[in-house]
Amino acid sequence: MTSRTILPRLHNSAREYARKVALFSPNARYYLVFMVLNGAAFGIYRLLFNFYVLSLGYDEALLGRLLTTVSLVQLVAALPAGYFSDRIGRKPSLMLAALASVATLVGMVVWPTALGFYTMSVLMGLAQSLSAVTYGPFMMENSEEEERTYLFALSSGMGMIAQFMGNWLGGQLPATIAGWLGVSATGSTAYGVALVVVAVLASTALAPILLIRRQHKHGPQDGYLSPFAVARSQPRTLFRLIMPMWVTSLGAGLLMPFMNIFYRHTYGSSDATIGALFAVGSLFMAIGLIVAPPLADRYGKMALVIVTQALSIPFLFLLGFAP
């Protein structure tokens, strides 16, 4: 394949991508803006939260329990949150989840005790669960089949680009705040003020949600199918869909929340270095998400998923044995 054939194909793919993006509804565009602002805020949060807890004198055991609490609440609340989102609508659900997330960030700064962290972890889990179960139905209701794959991919890609910016900014933020306040860059004051900055940035994500126009709620009369009904009618299909995601999520849950602690304790990396590493990872994930739709159109969705998942395994082994 020569450049004479590659360039026209790239040009045609770019034109097709732009055509699909032009089909996005106003609500979908507002949600993309929300994804960028929220993704940047929580890119900073995910980088610095572990360091904030440890800087207060707590140990990794408490940190692990806090992260487990968030995940457990997300799991338990997922089904009720789905019903709740169906009942009150997508826009109120997104607004409530965003407000709860902001309240959680502020609460972690003003109530930095073990009880406070557990309470805020429960609230964060509820907020993230409600946001997660609302995301998919909202995107489905505000897109047509022609552009839907591109909307999902671009929203995820833009979210990862926002996390790239948040990771990079998060790496610089504690040292910058420490310079302004005359405190230690790895102390609780610098990390606490950084979380306040995250809360302010997350608050700006409320603006695009306010611009979203409410859609008609799809209830049981509109063909709603209970997840229990799906489990009863197609148990084998549901099992095949859930198991790969369950195994992948289990591995990610054991590894990813502690990557920043791993870099700090194993390699003595600074916040800026860790932020840069996280940012590079987010950037490449964003590129992969954005180019996924044309690749899926060309090679098939299932083949693309299998190949990309398989390629990640050797790199996980290399990470564990890196010098």
Task: Please name every model-derived segment.
Residues 65-82, 279-292:
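Central cavity-lining transmembrane alpha-helices of secondary-active solute carriers
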Residues 13-73, 237-278:
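Helix-loop boundary and gating motifs at the non-cytosolic
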Residues 199-218:
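C-terminal membrane-cytosol helix-exit motif in multi-pass small-molecule transporters
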Residues 36, 104, 115-131, 246-247:
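Hydrophobic core of transmembrane alpha-helices in multi-pass small-molecule transporters
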